[in-house]
Amino acid sequence: MEYTHQSSWIIPFIPLPVPILIGVGLLLFPTATKNLRRMWAFPSIFLLTIVMIFSIDLSIQQIENSSIYQYVWSWTINNDLSLEFGYLIDSLTSIMSILITTVGILVLIYSDSYMSHDQGYLRFFTYMSFFNTSMLGLVTSSNLIQVYIFWELVGMCSYLLIGFWFTRPIAANACQKAFVTNRVGDFGLLLGILGFYWITGSLEFRDLFQIFKNLIYKNEVNILFVTLCALLLFCGSVAKSAQFPLHVWLPDAMEGPTPISALIHAATMVAAGIFLVARLLPLFIVIPSIMSGIALIGIITVVLGATLAIAQKDIKKNLAYSTMSQLGYMMLALGMGSYRAALFHLITHAYSKALLFLGSGSIIHSMEAIVGYSPDKSQNMVLMGGLTKHAPITKMSFLIGTLSLCGIPPFACFWSKDEILNDSWLYSPIFAIIACSTAGLTAFYMFRIYLLVFEGYLNVHFQNFNGKKNSSFYSISLWGKEEKKKLKKKIHLLGFLTMNNNERTSFFRERTYSHRINRNVKSIRRLFLDSTHFGTKNLPFFYPHESDNTMLFSMLVLVLFTFFVGSIGISFSQEGIDLDILSKLLIPSIDLLHQNSKNSVDWYEFFINATFSVSIAFFGLFIASFFYKPVFSSLQNLNLFNLFQKNVPKKIISDKIINILYDWSYNRGYIDAFFEVSLIASVRKLAKFNYFFDRQLIDGIPNGVGISNFFIGEAIKYVGGGRISSYIFFFVLIFLLICYYIYLFP
């Protein structure tokens, strides 16, 4: 065991040779390296597998011994200054290392197929390997300086991958937005680190916690200054984990390749913020106002993320807002002091969300066979539907991930989310009501995604309803940029929707198919395929297809994780049988809500607690099915249902309210617009004023002196022309002026 801990310093550096060797290969042997580019997937996966085995071994030892191992190297610069670097191995490090490596391996396997067509394949694997290195360095850091260094490296890799297709302006803008937003949080984190170093004189976690606790108990520090420093530390996590109000970068980050979206949302970028709060929780718990602030930010993010997800038409942005909401649950749990529940949900959510993103990548891949490379179309759920028979394995995997995130037993997220909801009742009934209501909303928008994508009919075949020809494929440049100029075309989805490509979709999926269409689906497609009215007589229709085995393998492994990973946190203890592996791993742990009670609960208590949360989730599923499942269109044909709709009082007012809520959700709560007006526009005006001030005043003074000297010189050169008469004339003129001046002012 001692040898394993002593060798743990190498964990972050094991994946590092891959980006180094790729860089050297491109420098020395560019042609051979590019021709053999697919071979680099193997060393990337192999080295990360070694780290995973190492991490599992550390976790087993942690369960058996509950030990904390820290090793520090000190570099003394002078008598007053020394730098210390080291690594810390504890329960949090073990959990995060397993999470990073398992998800990372599956994403790399998936990416080998997903990115095989992309000429940036080598660049992608270079970034991914360095991303894993940076995240592993972050979780093994023993002090705040190392945390900040690897924190910035994690951010840098995220920006590179978000803007991976940098020739697309929207991807470049998304990268810039993520960078600028995170600069706010990272600047706060740096100030917080400096503030606590000034207070305690140490940056090592254990020393920092002990010194700070003693200072607080002895009342030897200014509580306002301490609270400000803690708030600044928390700002870093707010930005990195996309918490309100620094969440605006996360949906735009979906412009990167889908595999990196899975890694960012499951185990790296956004998980880093939760990790930092969990690591610094011993520091925060001695400041009650900070804990309350963390819980408040968490519950606001829970609600905001869920409400903004209900009207999105882009499948990846929908999942991004889902991630934002689930991270809010984790932050809420940490703010309540429920350390175990937060980390439990971090684990279960990581595998479920990775499964959903890889599933969405499979869907996007299959849609590209129809629409070509066009993210506005291949990620648009309005154009999907009926993918069940075309991609059955993807459908099954996506459904399992959806049910897990909805909180349906026995899938992973049910166990962790139920624990957070139960703890919220102990913390604040108001927070509990909000959290439980949002759980139902989560079930609604997640099942909405599933129904829009897999149920009904394939809507993309109806996009030529206006009778104009439109090729199914687009000309793609090197980085996926469309060569063809986009046209705004109206899409009529057979009574389902009339919209422009750039406009919103309907909040409810109100399909009104004709009687013939409802009776015979095959006749619909024959009708559309044969009709010359749609301008598609000579154009073949393509259908979505199932992904290849490499991509499906990663998804199926994540399905197994989604089924069974929740069992590690089952807190039942019946007749001497203790199934709670997570509690053993998290010793010592922090739990402010169960200080005087046992962690385990009996089956009856669990059943009572779970019934309520599961009922809310099923209610959300039912509402989503009612509005989005194709059977809803049949209900509209019933006279009783139509009569009910016509006789509902004030239906027009209710429709207006629904449209207002829809617009609010679709436009991201107008938060981006608010930042655009209040911050970006103000900064631009200030920049223009500074530009004017600099050019007209700062530069105007030396420029004015130079110009005046030029004109004076031009005037003087006519005086000294070599004529004696000119000299006498100017001499007499100046003499008379002097005399006149003396006469006026004696």
From Swiss-Prot:
Membrane-crossing residue ranges in chain numbering: 9-29, 40-60, 89-109, 121-140, 147-167, 185-205, 219-239, 258-278, 280-300, 327-347, 354-374, 396-416, 425-445, 552-572, 606-626, 726-746
One of the record's GO molecular function terms: NADH dehydrogenase (ubiquinone) activity
Membrane topology, from the record: Multi-pass membrane protein
EC number of the protein: 7.1.1.-
Subcellular location: Plastid, Chloroplast thylakoid membrane
Catalyzed reactions per annotation: a plastoquinone + NADH + (n+1) H(+)(in) = a plastoquinol + NAD(+) + n H(+)(out); a plastoquinone + NADPH + (n+1) H(+)(in) = a plastoquinol + NADP(+) + n H(+)(out)
Annotated GO CC locations: chloroplast thylakoid membrane
Keywords of this entry: Chloroplast, Membrane, NAD, NADP, Plastid, Plastoquinone, Quinone, Thylakoid, Translocase, Transmembrane, Transmembrane helix, Transport
Gene Ontology BP, a term: ATP synthesis coupled electron transport
Cysteine pairs bridged by disulfides in the record: none
Top EC class of this enzyme: translocase
Superkingdom assignment: Eukaryota
Family the UniProt entry places it in: Belongs to the complex I subunit 5 family.
Subunit details: NDH is composed of at least 16 different subunits, 5 of which are encoded in the nucleus.
Protein's job: NDH shuttles electrons from NAD(P)H:plastoquinone, via FMN and iron-sulfur (Fe-S) centers, to quinones in the photosynthetic chain and possibly in a chloroplast respiratory chain. The immediate electron acceptor for the enzyme in this species is believed to be plastoquinone. Couples the redox reaction to proton translocation, and thus conserves the redox energy in a proton gradient.
Annotated protein name in UniProt: NAD(P)H-quinone oxidoreductase subunit 5, chloroplastic
The gene coding this protein: ndhF
